[in-house]
A protein has these predicted regions:
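Single conserved hydrophobic/aromatic residue that forms the stacking wall/gate
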Residues: 235-244
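Function-determining sites in protein domains
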Residues: 231
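Peripheral, non-transmembrane regulatory/ligand-interaction domains of membrane transport proteins
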Residues: 1-207, 213-227
């Protein structure tokens, strides 16, 4: 799926859905076909390997620059239903900065990006590309923290039920949440390295306020790492006490 959006003007941040690619637009690509990838590469001049990179769910967080195109790959959090229970996972998202456009590519539709489409983000403009990247990164941190709080609440509820009566279902749910914390921890630590590198990229140093925003994102990411580690230690302790 390919969606092309453009902010109406400097004074109006509402998005217009376009039929064709224009300078200053945002190209949002979700689970694309090979034909769609070739089309985007041809129309934008972005290397096909940049567009394909996030479609490998094992792709790690990184920054790469080639012929004036910068790709930032970060892991973003998702929720999924599995056996009538909400589970948490991460998938790669590519944010590609070119001279004329911003392109996002992901295997799945993400709340992080639909929030921009649905007008939930203030002062968002598709043509302010470096600021847009930072706003996406900030939204990713927000969802990590939100999902970590959800995991915390779910874990406490399950632990209370387990102490009343040992049930396989609760144990399975607890192990599932532990797995989610491992995914989050790995992804957040990889993202941290990418965010630190982003501070040194020339295109992100144009405006001093952008650097401030990026530093705030790095702080939030560190908070999410700390929350993940604390919750994971508590999980391990709880599972050990239950198996004793």
């Amino acid at each position: 799926m390919i969606q092309i959006y453009k902010s109406s003007s400097e004074n109006n941040s509402s998005l217009t859905l376009l039929d064709n690619i224009e300078t200053g637009c945002w190209i949002n690509v979700v689970a694309p076909s090979d034909e769609e990838l070739l089309l985007i590469s041809k129309k934008t001049g972005v290397p096909i390997q940049f567009l394909k990179a996030p479609l490998d769910d094992e792709e790690t967080s990184r920054i790469d620059i080639e012929d004036g195109n910068m790709i930032v790959i970060v892991d973003i959090p998702f929720t999924e239903m599995e056996d009538n229970s909400l589970t948490y996972d991460t998938y790669p998202l590519a944010i590609i900065h070119t001279e004329s456009f911003l392109i996002t590519v992901c295997l799945k539709n993400s709340k992080v990006l639909t929030d921009f489409i649905n007008g939930k983000i203030k002062s968002f403009f598709t043509f302010k590309k470096s600021r847009f990247i930072l706003q996406i990164l900030n939204r990713i941190s927000t969802y990590y923290l939100l999902y970590l709080r959800q995991i915390d609440k779910k874990s406490l509820m399950i632990e209370k039920r387990l102490h009343k009566s040992m049930k396989n279902r609760e144990l399975i749910q607890l192990h599932s949440l532990e797995k989610s914390l491992v995914y989050f921890s790995t992804s957040l630590k990889a993202n941290e390295i990418t965010l630190e590198k982003l501070l040194k990229v020339e295109v992100m140093q144009k405006y001093s306020e952008d650097k401030d925003v990026l530093e705030d994102v790095i702080i939030e990411n560190k908070q999410a790492i700390e929350m993940t580690e604390i919750r994971s230690e508590e999980h391990t302790s709880e599972l050990q006490s239950l198996s004793a």
